[in-house]
Amino acid sequence: MRVGPVRFALSGASQPRGPGLLFPAARGTPAKRLLDTDDAGAVAAKCPRLSECSSPPDYLSPPGSPCSPQPPPSTQGTGGSCVSSPGPSRIADYLLLPLAEREHVSRALCIHTGRELRCKEFPIKHYQDKIRPYIQLPSHSNITGIVEVLLGESKAYVFFEKDFGDMHSYVRSRKRLREEEAARLFKQIVSAVAHCHQSAIVLGDLKLRKFVFSTEERTQLRLESLEDTHIIKGEDDALSDKHGCPAYVSPEILNTTGTYSGKAADVWSLGVMLYTLLVGRYPFHDSDPSALFSKIRRGQFCIPEHVSPKARCLIRSLLRREPSERLTAPQILLHPWFEYVLEPGYVDSEIGTSDQIVPEYQEDSDISSFFC
């Protein structure tokens, strides 16, 4: 994956101009610009110039030059401490505007070009683990990549391309999709998941909300939020994690106290996603979590008549109670439904009003407390 440079804040106005500690050149052309800091003296002691370092820092080595961005307006707190007030802040060449609906995520506007990105903030001690999946994955058109990383004293600021809304919100607004559109979008979803699986990464908490539109036309999708994925070793994809969205959880996660196949669980989630795209509601739904999990354990669901036979076949091939009987992500891409629906001359059925729209769930929850 092509990754932009990590830039470390090096100096304030009193420091000499010089290159910062950057990504190795193999990862792209490093940016050699200074960042603002709130304590030039402290930064001078902590941040040696690249020419003073014995060797260039490894991409995932501990940060050698942390310092803070220009802080937002602050007020005096108890004990004389400063408390940041909500609102825009500035770091390097970016104006950060927090998104109310997404914690620790901001719109990032370049003050020179007007380019808009998304900025995620991570604790400096944990940012390496958070961005590791992005680094491990080879470049893919349906998976988001890192544009730039800026390191502060306490936080890492990771910049991504902006998006144009997520799939969950899109399906809620459309009720359900025609099969031709669903096939085009679902093929991109599966392609991203297959690429992750082939690169030793299991998604774990896979859901529609993790896929966002890359363009305003809403024809191109990309997978984002890889921070909570699982990096596996070899062919062993056994997981024991029970963290995720209840609507997408697979039966084996509910039925076992040990481990389960992470890839097979991802495929089950793909089945839930495809059903939701075509029907406009989840295959298993109940406001009571215990009742919901009982339905998932039984694995019984109804596919409406308007769904084509080939689409029904694919859904059933994904939502099998036995994990070993499910298709793999690469096998899904070979299913005849895609060719059938996407071939010229295909006529879709009329869109009707779904009797139940996709509900809002607590998307990021620990489901282990609901287990019997």
From Swiss-Prot:
Residues 91-338 form the Protein kinase domain. Residues 59-74 have a biased composition (Pro residues). Residues 1-26, 49-85 are annotated as: Disordered. CDD domains: PK_TRB1. SUPFAM superfamilies: Protein kinase-like (PK-like). One of its GO terms (molecular function) is protein kinase inhibitor activity. It comes from the Eukaryota. GO terms for cellular component: cytoplasm; nucleus. A motif (COP1-binding) lies at residues 355-360. InterPro entries: Kinase-like_dom_sf (IPR011009), Prot_kinase_dom (IPR000719), TRB1_pseudokinase_dom (IPR024105), Tribbles/Ser_Thr_kinase_40 (IPR024104). Keywords: Protein kinase inhibitor. GO terms for biological process: JNK cascade; negative regulation of JNK cascade; negative regulation of lipopolysaccharide-mediated signaling pathway; negative regulation of MAPK cascade; negative regulation of neutrophil differentiation; negative regulation of smooth muscle cell migration; negative regulation of smooth muscle cell proliferation; negative regulation of transcription by RNA polymerase II. Adapter protein involved in protein degradation by interacting with COP1 ubiquitin ligase. Promotes CEBPA degradation and inhibits its function. Controls macrophage, eosinophil and neutrophil differentiation via the COP1-binding domain. Regulates myeloid cell differentiation by altering the expression of CEBPA in a COP1-dependent manner. Interacts with MAPK kinases and regulates activation of MAP kinases, but has no kinase activity. The COP1-binding motif (355-360) is required for regulation activity. The C-terminus (351-372) is required for interaction with COP1. Monomer. Interacts (via protein kinase domain) with CEBPA. Interacts with COP1. Belongs to the protein kinase superfamily. CAMK Ser/Thr protein kinase family. Tribbles subfamily. PANTHER family: SER/THR PROTEIN KINASE-TRB, TRIBBLES HOMOLOG 1. This is Tribbles homolog 1. It comes from Mus musculus. The gene is Trib1.
